């Protein structure tokens, strides 16, 4: 069925006011979207971050009158509206559309990420079947791709791999399929832990091969290989902790880092690692090295 979509161009300071007002006048959903394709944001603690220029999208039943919606918003907020528009959009099978656009992808020489509803293009390759669920990591983002290609290029046979910030579990599971003896995944999000567990089962990974923990429950360890695809801020602040999680002679790969943040992150690890040249792709970087 069709819907009336209302779009408002707002600042972060206006977000809560207009979200509440839209719900008050009958919106069935309200969504925040980046208005300027800003690649990333890193919030301060105890804040609810938004992009500096944000679009607020609200859906109403198709018979809602947009002019009445706008009039009520003016009354509720006591102010003139920011830039705004309304249009009728047709309903779609969004899940099917997304599934159609998520195709098998190759990383490095051996590794393929294959959506669980697709046939593997190369039966004899290392095929990781993925159902990303809430899209914690599918391989489509440059940072995930950089980490997957790095894993494909390593000799992982018999190693223990730590995936710090595991999300969908894609990196930990890839490491196991590429020969790692065991993997450990940790994430602050319980849903990420569940997504990782589901994807491991889908790929026939035995429970004893992949241990998943919230950070506060993770045991003391030193891994042969650590991969962390998170954000530059945490990578810098956690550098002593992450460095300590890699055994001497072990390997490290970091991403989730914008190109302009690369030198700062590399500097945080330079004292403990012999670092490789930074690899850049589409404005994102990968930092890797070997523990001294």
UniProtKB/Swiss-Prot annotation:
Its EC number is 2.1.1.-. The keyword Methyltransferase applies. It is found in: Cytoplasm. GO terms for molecular function: protein-lysine N-methyltransferase activity. GO terms for cellular component: cytosol. S-adenosyl-L-methionine binds at residues 144, 165, 187, 229. It is an enzyme of class 2 (transferase). It catalyses: L-lysyl-[protein] + 3 S-adenosyl-L-methionine = N(6),N(6),N(6)-trimethyl-L-lysyl-[protein] + 3 S-adenosyl-L-homocysteine + 3 H(+). SUPFAM superfamilies: S-adenosyl-L-methionine-dependent methyltransferases (SSF53335). Keywords: Cytoplasm, Methyltransferase, S-adenosyl-L-methionine, Transferase. Its main location: cytoplasm. GO terms for biological process: methylation. Pfam families: PrmA. PANTHER family: ELECTRON TRANSFER FLAVOPROTEIN BETA SUBUNIT LYSINE METHYLTRANSFERASE (PTHR43648:SF1). Belongs to the methyltransferase superfamily. PrmA family. Methylates ribosomal protein L11. This is Ribosomal protein L11 methyltransferase. It comes from Pseudomonas putida (strain GB-1).
